[in-house]
Amino acid sequence: MAGGSGARETRCRQGSRPGSPGSEVPAASVTGPRAEARPAGGGGGSRRAAPDRCSGGVPSAAWQHPFLNVFRHFRVDEWKRSSKEGDVAVVTDKVLKSAVYRIRGSVSASNYIQLPRTSTQSLGLTGRYLYVLFRPVPTKHFVIHLDVSTEDGQVIRVSFSNLFKEFKSSTTWLQFPFVFETKTPRRDLAGVALPRARWTCLQLDLRDILMFYLGRHYSHLKSIRLCASLLVRNLYTSDLCFDPAVTVTEARRAKLSVNPMPREMAFPVPKGESWHDNYIHVRFPSDCSKVPDEQDEKSCSPPEAVFLGRMSRHLPHPGVLGKPLLSSKSPVAQACSSALPCQVLSASSRLPEVSRTYRYREVSSVSASSIQSQRPSVRDEVPDAHTVSGERHVLADRSSGVPMALEDIGSCRLFLPDPVLRLKGVIGFGGHSTQWALWTKDGVAVVYPCHAVIIVLQIDTGQQRFFLGHTDKVSALALNGSDTLLASAQVQPPSMVRLWDFQTGSCLSLFRSPLHTICSLSFSGSGALLCGVGKDRHGRTVVVAWSTEQAGLGGEVVVLAKVHTDFDIRAFQVAFFDETRMASCGRGSVRLWRLRGGVLRSCAVDLGEYCSLELTDLAFAQALDGHCAPSAGTLFVCSHSGHILEIDHQRMSVQHVRRLLPARSPGAPLAEKQNFSVGSGIAISSLSVSTATCAVGSEDGYLRLWPLDFSSVLLEAEHDGPVSSVSFSPDGLRVLSTTTSGHLGFLDVPSREYTVLARSHMAPVLALSTEPNRGQMATVSLDHTVRIWDLATLQQLYDFSSSEDTPCAVAFHPTMPNFFCGFSSGAVRSFSLESSGVLVEHTRHRGAITSLVITLDGRFLFSSCSQGSLVQYSCADSQCCVLRVAANMVCQDGRPNPNILAVSGDSCRLAFVGPSKCMVTIVESASLDELLRVDVSTLNLASNHLDWAVAICFSPGNSGHLLVSTSSNKVVVLDAVSGHTLRELSSVRSRACCSLALSEDAHLLLAATDRTITVWDYPTQANPSCQVYIGHSEPVHAVAFTPDQLQVISVGDAIFLWDILATPERDGGDHEAPPGHEAGSSSGQLDDLASGASGLPRQQVPIPFQALPPPLSSHDRLLDGSTGTFSTSDEEGLCEENHVSEALLQGQAPTPHVLVDREASGAGDAPRETAGSSWTPAERPSPHSHMSEWSLRSGKAGLPTRPDSYKHFTPRYKTSPRVKSVYFPPIGRERLRLKAIVGYNGNGRANMVWRPDTGFFAYTCGRLVVVEDLHSGTQRHWLGHSQEISTLALNQDGQILASASCCGNTAARCQIRIWDVPKGLCRHLLSHHDTAVQALAFSPDDEFLVTLGDYADRNLALWSMATYELLSSTRLLEPVHGVAFNPWDANELICVGTNAITFWLLQHHGADTCFQVHREPIPEELGASELTSLCYGASPLLYCGSSSGQVCVWDTGTGHCFLAWEADDGEIGVLLCSGSRLISGSNTKRLRLWAVGVVPELRRKGSSARSSSVFMERELTLDGAVVSASFDSGMDMGVVGTTAGTIWYISWTEGTSTRLISGHRTKVNEVVFSPGESHCATCGEDGSVRVWSLASMELVIQFQVLNQSCLCLAWTPPSCELPEQQQVVAGYSDGTLRVFSISRTAMELKMHPHRTALTAIAFSTDGQTILSGDKDGLVAISHPCTGMTFRVLSDHRGAPISAIQSTSKEYGDLGVEGVELWLAASGDQRVSIWVSDWLRDRCELLEWLSFPAPAVSEAPGLLPPSLAAFCPWDKAILVCVGLGAHEEVIFYSLRQKQVIQKTPLPFFAMSLSLSPGSQLMVVGFAECMMRLLDCASGTAQDLEGHDDSVHLCRFTPSGRLLFTAAHNEILVWEVTDP
C-alpha cells in the first residue's frame, strides 16, 4: 500500500463485525502521521508515497486484487481508522435488505464520514476504479470528496455534488456537478435528488480523470469524505472494470471481455426483473466495453436521468478527451448523439464491425501539446474510441428505448493521421504586454509571447517553435543564461507560473504563485533562482524568490522568500555576477536587494534631488569578459523625464546623472548634465547596456544608441509607435526593440540595417479573406486597421488604417488585385493593391457592416449591416457599382460575423441569416429572387429554448448542401433545394460555432467555437470524429482554408496558421450518402422528437416552407409592406444614394409620389463636408418660418438615417388612429377619476427628474406626466400632450418643468409644454420641431430654454422663458446627441455629436439673439467618433461620454481634450458630475461611480495627463440601458430610469439598488383580481406573470417563462377562499397552461392541452375546472388537480377564441339542468353559451349566436375582437361587441332568445368590461379613448389618457376600481358616485 516515506510492514488481518456493511477482505493498516510531508509554501504540497508491503513481501497492489472492500478493510464500524461527524447512523435498507450508513443533515460540511481518520494519513489504495454504492436522500443534496495523489506527489481533490452548478477546475481541485434531471417538462426537480432516488453504483476511473482533465498520472487514493445527505452501502477499489448488469453466466455464454460484478458488490435483483429496472449505474469518464443485449431494445425510457450537466468553463487542456458510457445496458451513447457532442478519438485503424470486444492501440491526446508531439501517450490501451471532447459530466441513464446498433459504432471513422492539424506559424506579438522579447544565448533566435502562446523565432530562417499550455495571456517571461529554463506567467489571477525545458519545449513545473498578478520575472545567470514581482489581491507590491534547482530533475519549485513592499517597482533584475543580489526601480525609488538565509532585504539608494523621478528601467553594466562589471559594477537607471542615472551598487550611491535631450542637428553633442527643470527630455521607457554602448528606447518612437558617456547619439532608428523595450544581443551587435503598436524587430549595428521580425494587430481580429493567386491574406481588426499578409513568410505587406472608422468585414476579389472592406459606419470601400488606395466608396448601409462575400466568378459582391439591409454590387470591373438595396433582409445583429452571408460554389445562390435570426434564406445571386426559407427554430423540436442560426456555409462545388451552425451547439446540414435536414453534427464545446469552413474536397469541416477550433471528418455519416485544438486566449472569430487547401487559418486574438497533415485521398467508403437517404432518416428522427417533445402527437413534421414566386416588380413588393428591394443604375443618371424610410422598415407602405433628394451635406457616396474649427456665425432664420424648402422636405421626405446611438428617442410604432373630438363630462361630474399609473416609459430619454431638496419627483408614461410623492406614493397626473413624451427638464429653482412630445396625426409639430410645478398647470405651449425633441435644457439663470430636435429634425432652438418667444433656430448639418448649458456662463452651451464637440455662444444685439459656433474635432487618439453624452464638472471641466465607452475630459477654456479613459464596454448615454464624483450610465446596463477629484490637477499637465489616477468606486448592474438619472449633490443617492421600464433608487453608500417604479416592458395581455381585492395579477408578451398589491400597486411576485408569451390569465374564483387555494392559471403561446400558487410563490402544474397559442382562459365557478381556448378555436376542459384534459370542444374550430367566461346559475334555471353557465366567443363573430355540471360530467350547448360582419376590407385599421360577457346584474343577459354591421353594443336575453337592446358606439370596440357593483360598462377603442356607459340612466362619458389602442378594460370584483391598458401602460381609475 502506498503510504509513508519508507516501507512499513503490517500483518494481514481478517475479521467481521455484525451490523457493519460490507464483507471480509484482507486488510492492512493505515500509514501513520509521518506518511507524508508538506513543503513550506502551502498549496497542496508534495505528497510522495513509498511502496508498502504486506507480510510475506507481497507488493501492495497484489493484496488489493481483485478488489478491496474499503469499509471492511478500515473497520469503519469501529471508528478508529475513520471518523464521523454529525448525524451518521447505521440503518437497514429495505431494498438492499442489509445494513447501510445514513448520513444526513442540513449542512453537508458538518455531517460526513471520512477515511482515514486524519488528513495526515493516507489510504494508499492503488486501484484504478473506485466503486461508490450509494443512494441520495430524496430532495436533498450530497457531496463526495476524493483526495487523489499523482505520481509526482501532487494531491488533487476530486469532488462530485449536486450542489455544484458548473464544472470548475484548478491545478489542485476538480469539481463535477452531479445533476438529477427529469425527462418530463418539470424543471423544479432539477438539481436535488428526485423523490424516487435509486441506489446507484458510481464507478470512477481515477486514472483517466486525472489524465483527461489535468494531464497527470494517477498514483493512489489518499482519502475519502462522504458528506450529507446520502445512504452509502460500501466503497470498493479495483483495477478491474465491472459491469453490475452482467452475470457470470451471461459473460461466459457470450464470451464477453467485461467482468461481472462480484457477488459481494452486487445489488440484489428481484426475480424476473433486470438490474437497470431497479438501480442506476454511472461510469465516469469512460466505459470498458460495449456489451450488446437484445432485451434492452424492449425496455422503456425511465423518467429520470442522472448526469453532470454541460459546463461553461474551459479545461486546462481542452484537447484531452473524455469518453462516455457505451454499454447497451445504459445506452448513454444514444443520449450523447442528441444531447451531447459525441466524438471519436483519432487512431490509425478503423473500429472493428464484427467483434464485440474492442481494444485499440495507444493514441495521443488531441491537445496543444500533441501538436508538437512532445507529450507521450497517456495510457496503454483505449477501451473504446467514442469520446466526448471538452465535456465534464457524468451520465447515468437507464435504457432509452432507442438502442444504438453495433454497426453505428463501427461506422465511425478516424482521422489519418492524428492529429490532423499542426500549428505552423503565428502572426502576432504581445497581447497583454509588448515589453517581453528575449534573445537566446547564441543570438540566433528571439523568444516572445503572443497572447497565450510563447514563440521562439529563428531569425535567419523565420521558423517558429511554440510553447503551448497557458490558458490566458502571458504577462511575463524570463530565460536563464544557459538557455535551459524558460519561465512564464499568465494574467488570469491567481497568476500561474510555468517552468519550461527550453530545449525540448516540455513543461517541467506548473505552480500557483502567491501573487495575484505577476508583472515581471527575472532569472539568475545559472537559472537556480527565479524572482517575480507583482501585486497581491489587495494591490500591494510583492517580490517572490523561487528555487528552481530541482525542477529539471523532476523536483518542485520552492518558495525561498517573499516580501511585501510599499514602494513602486517598474523593473526588477537579478545581477548576472551575483545571483544573491538584485536591483529594482520605480517611481522615486532605486533599491538594491539581497537574498540571504531565506530572507529578501532591500536598501534604498539615496537619489537626492532626483527622488521624484519616474524611473522606468534598469540594466547592469557588462564587462568585456562577461563576469564582472567595470568600476566594481555599475547600474544604469533611466527615467520618463530623460535622465540616466549611473549608480555604484557597492557604494549605493549615484555617480553620474545625465539628461538626454532631442538632438538639434545630427551629431550635435548633448550636455553631460543639465538642470533638472531645463528643457523637455526624452521620455525613456527602456534601456539596455553592452560593453561599450547603451541602447535607449523612448516614447517618441526612437531607438537610440549612445556611448557610455552619453556624449552623442551614435545611431537611431524610428518606429511607428512608442518603444516599449530594447535588448542587446549577447554579442552586442544587434539591438532588439518592441513597440506598443505591436512591432518587433532588431537593429544590426555594424550594417546599420533594421529588420522587422513581427507585426501584430493590437485588438481582436474580426475577419479574414485569402487571395487565391498571390498567396495573400487580408485581416480586419478592432484596432482600425486593414492588413495584408504574405502567407508564405507571414510578413505584413500593406497596412490601411482609419482613425475614425473600424473595419468589420473583408473580401478579396477572386480575379483582380482588389479587395473590399466594410466598416462600422456602414461604408463599403474598394481598395487597390496596385495603387494602395481607395478605388470607390459606397455608403448605402445605415448600420455597421456585418459581413461581406463575393461570388467565386467575381461578378457580384454582397454586404449586410446591423440594421438588416442587404446590398448587391456589380464588381466585374474595378469600378464597383450598386445594383440593389434590400431592407430588412438580413438578421439585425450588431456584431460582425463573416459567416452571416454565404455564396454557393457555382456562384448562383446566396444564403444569409434573415430576416430574423431563426431564419435562413437562399436567393438567386443575380436577381435576389427568393428560392427557399428555412426556419431553424423548428429543426430541434426537443429543445426547450428557441434555436437560431449563428453561421452558414455552402458545401463546395454544386453538391447542394448548406451547413448551418445553430445556437444549440450543433451544425445542421440542409438540402439547399428542399430544405430538408440531411444530418447533424454536435459541437464538442458548450458554445455555438460562430464560423464554418469546408474544404474543397469536402473532407474536413472547420468550426470556430469559443477559443477552440473543431475539425470534423465530414464524409463520415454516423458519429463523425472530430478533434479540438487550443491556443487562442480569446474567442476565435473566423476560420478558413488557404487557397491551396494545404493549411488552415484561424483568427481571433492573433492569426494562427495550421498545417493540414491529412492526405486528400480517401477510400471509397468515405463518400457521402445520397441526399435522399439522409433526408429520409433525418425526417424520421424529427418525427420521433416531435412526438416526444410535447404531450400531443404532431400531424406532420415541420418542414421548411417554399418561398412564394418572386414578385413582378420590386415596386409592388414595397407597396405590399414586405421586404423592400429596389434597383438603381448609374447609367440612368438617378441619385446614387437611396435610403429606405423608417416607415418602410416597419412595414408601412410609402406615400405615393415622394421625391427623394440627396441631402446637401452628402449622405451618399461622396465625402461629407464638415464644419471647420473656427468661430463662424450661424444662420438665423425667422422664428416663425422654416429655414428653406429643403429643410421642410428633409423632415418629412428626406428619409434621414437614424444614428447608431441609443440616445435618440424613437417613438414606439402605433397603428391606432387619433380621435379629433371627445365628449368630456362636465368638471366635477366625472364618474372615473385617474388614481394611479403603473409603469414608466423606458422608451423615453431623460424623461425622469428628481429634486432632492424639495422632493419633487416626476416621470413620464406614454403621453402623461406623473408627479409622485415618494413618501406616500400618491400621484398627480398632468394631461395635455397628444403623443408620447420624449424628454423632461426641470429649471434651476425647480418651479418650471418642460416636457416635449413627438408629432403625430393630431399634431403636425412637436408639443413642448411648460408646467407650473406648484400649481400643476400648463403655462404655455411651444411648437417648432417637426419630428421629435431629443433634449431640453434650461440656462443657469432660467432665462433661456434650448430645445434640440432629433436626427430627422436637426434643429437647435433657443426660447425666452420670459416671453416664450423663439429667439433663434439653427439647422444642424448632422445629428446631435446631447446639449447642455455652461453652468458658469448662461450665454454658452455645448453640443456633442459625430466627430466633434460644438461650442455655441449667444450674442445679443438689441432684441435679436444669434449664435456663434466653434467646432472642435475629437482627437484622433481617442478613437471615438461619436460623443453621446456630456455634463459639466468643476470649472472649467466638461466630461463627455462616447459610443465606444470612453469618457473624455475637455478644458472649456482652451477647447481641448486633455484626458480620456475607458469607462465602459458600450455606449455611455448618461453622465452626471458633482464635486469629485462622476456617474456614468450606458447601454450595457451598468451604472458606475468614478472618483475624479484629481482631474483638475491633471488638467494642468495638459496632454501628458494620464487617466490612471481616475478610478471606479462602485458599480451596479441594472435591468436595462440607462436613459435617465438624477442624484443629490453628494452623489450618494439618486434615482435612475432604464429601458426596461424601471426606475431604481440607488444608494452608493450601501451599494444597493431598489425598485421604485416597475412595469411591463411589452404589451399587457390581461389583468385579473383576487377575490378579496387585495392583489391583482397581470401578464405580458415577455412571458411574465406579475402579482401586485392593489393598495400600493407595488410588485409582489413575478413568475417568468422564457421564450414564450403569456396571452391570458385567470384567478381562482371566490369559492376558493383559503390562502392555499389562491392560484393563478396562465396560458402561453406554445399551447401550455401553467398553474401558479400565490401562497407558495411556485408553479404547481404545467399542462399542454393545446397545440397552438392559448388566447382565453377561465376557472369554473367552483375553481375545480379550467376552461381554455386557443388560436385554432378549440376549447379544452381540464382538471387543475390532476392535470388531465377530459374534454375538447371543436365547435369554434377555424377562428381564435377571444373570450371565455363562466358564471353560476340555479340548477333548473333557463330550462336546463346544470349549476354553471359559461360562454365562448370567437373571432368569426360567433358566441356559444353552455350549461355544465362538471361533477356529473355534463356539458350541453344552450345557445349559439352568430352576428353578421362586413367584409374585412370595410373595417378600417386593426380588426376588433369579438367579445361577450354575462351581465353582472342579470346573468341571463349577454353583452356582445365586435365587428358587426354597426358600431354598437348588443344586449341579448337568454330567456327571451332575442336581442333586447342596442347601444351605439363611436367606434368598434377593442375591449369591454362590466362593473359588478353598479350598472356601468366601459368600452375601449383603438382611437386611444374609452367610453363609460351607465346602463341604468343611458348616459355616457368619454375619457382619454392612453397613448395607444385601449385593448384591455377590467373592473375589480367590487366595482370600485377600473384597470385599463394600452400596450404596456396600465391606468387605474377610481369609480365615483354620480
Swiss-Prot record:
- List the SMART domains: WD40
Q: Which PROSITE patterns match?
A: WD_REPEATS_1 (PS00678), WD_REPEATS_2 (PS50082), WD_REPEATS_REGION (PS50294)
Q: List the GO molecular function terms.
A: microtubule binding
List the keywords (alphabetical): Cilium biogenesis/degradation, Cytoplasm, Cytoskeleton, Microtubule, Phosphoprotein, Repeat, WD repeat
GO cellular-component term (any): cytoplasm
Region Binds with microtubules, annotated ranges: 59-267
**Which Pfam family, giving just one, matches this sequence?**
Beta-prop_EML
Q: From which domain of life does this come?
A: Eukaryota
InterPro entries in the record, alphabetically? Beta-prop_EML_1st, Beta-prop_WDR90_POC16_2nd, CFA20_dom, WD40/YVTN_repeat-like_dom_sf, WD40_repeat_CS, WD40_repeat_dom_sf, WD40_rpt, WD_repeat_EMAP
- Name of the protein in its database record: WD repeat-containing protein 90
Q: Say which species the protein is native to.
A: Mus musculus (Mouse)
